[in-house]
Design a protein with these regions (language model features):
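PLD/PLD-like phosphodiesterase catalytic module centered on the HKD motif
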Residues: 7-12, 17-160
Length: 160
C-alpha cells in the first residue's frame, strides 16, 4: 500500500491473482484518478479455473477509474512485482489476494536507489509488450453469464 500511496508518476503491478479488498481497490482507483499511471498485469491463461473470473470481477471498476489492465498472453505469468516512479520496487512471493495479505507468511525484496530497478522496469515493459490491454468499452460488452460467474466467484474471494 505504501508504494501506491506515495507514487507520483506511475505504479506497475504484476500479479497472477488480483483478488483485492475494497481498501486496496479504492487505493488503486484513487491513485489513477489523481493522475498516477496505474498498470496491472495479470495472466490471460489461468492456472486455477475459479481464480481468473474472481480476478476479473474487479476489472470494471478499476478501468472506470483509469487503471490500465493488461493480460499476459504468451502463457501463465506468475510474477509478483511492484514498481513505482523508477525509485522503488518489490519482487517476491506476495500475490494480490486475501491469502497472501492475511494468512500466509510471504517474503519479498524491497529495492530503493539501486540500478536493479531499471532492470525490473525493462522486464515489465517487455511483459507489457506481450500483453493485451483490456479496454473498458469492450469489457462492458462481455456476456451477462460471464458477469454473473465473476460475481458468484467473487463471493468466495476471501477464501481464495
Amino acid at each position: 500500500m505504501q508504494i501506491r500511496g506515495t507514487a507520483r508518476k506511475y505504479v506497475y503491478i504484476l500479479t497472477p491473482y488480483l483478488i483485492i479488498d475494497n481498501t486496496m481497490q479504492q487505493a488503486l482507483c484513487l491513485a489513477a484518478q489523481a493522475g498516477v499511471d496505474v498498470r496491472i498485469v495479470t495472466p490471460k491463461i489461468r492456472d486455477k479455473w475459479y481464480v481468473h473470473p474472481a480476478t476479473q470481477f474487479t476489472y470494471e471498476e478499476l478501468l472506470r477509474s483509469g487503471v490500465r489492465i493488461f493480460e499476459y498472453t504468451p502463457g501463465f505469468i506468475h510474477s509478483k512485482v511492484f514498481l513505482s516512479d523508477d525509485m522503488v520496487a518489490t519482487v517476491g512471493t506476495v500475490n494480490m489476494d486475501y491469502r497472501s495479505f492475511y494468512f500466509h507468511f510471504e517474503c519479498g525484496v524491497f529495492m530503493q536507489g539501486t540500478s536493479a530497478i531499471k532492470d525490473v522496469k525493462d522486464d515489465i515493459e517487455s511483459i507489457l509488450a506481450d500483453s493485451e490491454e483490456i479496454v473498458l468499452s469492450k469489457w462492458e460488452k462481455r456476456p451477462w453469464y460471464k458477469k454473473l460467474w465473476e460475481t458468484l466467484l467473487h463471493v468466495f474471494a476471501p477464501f481464495m
